Amino acid sequence: MKSGVISQHSHSTLLTPNSEYMSIITKKKGTLEYLTAEGITVPHGFTTRYGGVSVGTQYSLNLAFGRGDTMENVEENLRRLGAAVGFDPEKLVMTRQIHSDIVRVVTDGDCAGFCHRDYPECDALVTNTPGVTLLVFTADCTPLLLHDPVTGAVGAAHAGWRGTALGIGVKTVEAMVKNFGCKRSNIHAAIGPNIAQCHFETDGDVPAAMVEAYGPEAERYVERRGEKYYLDLKAINALALRRAGVRNIEISDACTYCQCDRFWSHRASRGERGSQGAVICCKEVCR
């Protein structure tokens, strides 16, 4: 653990047959706060709103360009995050998210220093290039981080309900297996804060898409209240990852809507918001 970083355990769920309990941890460096998973041993984190320099509706650790914040503020926020988590912000690769099932394989040739380039559209990134750091953005959608400690490969995915129905998490695992020779059973996954079932209200098309994708078992994670439906997208993504052969899955219990003072929530803010991120850095494996 880095000097100056304070750890505090928070509630989490772990879906890991034949594995010891691990938990999501809150870490702080100064005022900057982020969450990490015990099972992922490379620098990574799910950010909160705390610890940056942005103001107004982007207060304070906004990581997204193009939402009304200044480029200087976002760059400083990324520098602060890099210093806290332990990665070089000049070696970030980011996403231009479109609620798809597109996974990009990236190397250090895709790094361009913050966001000074147009990244291709995708909703997940994978790499096995040491030093490269992956970043996806959320503000209610479900962030997924993946790490194979044997090959060193990492992945990050943004799973909205459409991406969840399309299997973005599974396709990220498959990209790691295909491109880097990962074994599914070696991969550790962490599912970060999202809008929880208590507030994720939908019409019938959303649960129908989940049942079509994952069968009747998905109905366990759907609650009907009158004419509306409430879904647990963390549990559905965990179901998908388990079926893909991932055994070690840690799940944050944080709800972005319930804790909209701590996380950005698109629904709670009616779109007036910044974005938090899920970040993971590839490190060289010691042989």
Regions found by a protein language model. Give the residues of each.
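Active-site microenvironment for binding and transforming phosphate-containing groups
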Residues: 18-287
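Short, basic, low-complexity termini and linkers enriched in Ser/Thr/Gly/Pro
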Residues: 1-19, 287
